[in-house]
Every structure is written in structure tokens, then in C-alpha cells.
A protein has these predicted regions:
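Short, C-terminally biased terminal segments at protein or domain edges
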Residues: 1-49, 53-115
Length: 115
């Protein structure tokens, strides 16, 4: 159940990130939008890849990579908000999604490790 929720949330998050990046029109923002797009879409890609992991170790590794990418995504979101490249509603929505995914990833990693 939690895995399906994580898969669904990570896909919704990736869509939100792609739409956010496509909507940024401020010149000289491409270095930030490129980083945000890479980190933000990598979260879901790693979660999806974990579903077909070759081992428990591989499964945990993919989830931990997704966790790191979600943390990086939060950084880029905050930087884009603080530099006025995205509005408060966009920032709050995407950051909340990211935070919720991160919580599920932490719980999933702990469960997988038997903690």
C-alpha cells in the first residue's frame, strides 16, 4: 500500500516539477531549472527503478538515492523561490509534495533495513 502511494506521489511530483520548469520564463534561469528538473524527476525514476531491484541491497540503494535527490530538489525549489523565479503557491505545493515523499522514503528505508 505505501509503495503504491509512493509511486503515485513521486509521479505526481515529477509532473509538477516538469510543469514548474516549463513555466519559468526569467532569463538566465536555465542552470537552476536544469538542476531542478534532473533532481526532481530522478526522485520518481529511482523509486520506480527500485520496484525491480535485483536484491534487497539494490532496493535500499535506489530508495536512498531517491531520498538524496528529494533533498537536493528542496534546495533548488527554495533557491528558485527566494530568487523570485517561482511564486509562493508553486513553492509551497511542490515543497509539500517533496517533503511528504521524503517522509515516506525515510520510513520505507527504515522498514527495508529492519529498523
Amino acid at each position: 500500500m505505501a509503495e503504491n502511494k509512493l509511486l503515485e506521489m513521486s509521479f505526481e511530483f515529477a509532473v509538477a516539477i516538469v510543469n514548474l520548469v516549463d513555466g519559468v520564463t526569467i532569463p538566465k534561469s536555465s542552470y537552476m531549472t536544469d538542476q531542478l528538473a534532473r533532481a526532481g524527476t530522478s526522485v520518481g525514476a529511482n523509486i520506480h527503478e527500485a520496484q525491480y531491484a535485483q536484491s534487497k541491497k539494490d532496493f535500499i540503494s535506489k530508495l536512498e538515492i531517491a531520498l538524496k535527490e528529494s533533498n537536493e530538489t528542496s534546495y533548488w525549489l527554495k533557491l528558485m523561490y527566494e530568487t523570485k523565479r517561482i511564486d509562493v503557491q508553486t513553492y509551497q505545493y511542490t515543497e509539500k509534495l517533496c517533503r511528504n515523499i521524503r517522509r515516506l522514503l525515510i520510513a520505507s528505508c527504515k522498514t527495508a533495513k529492519g529498523m
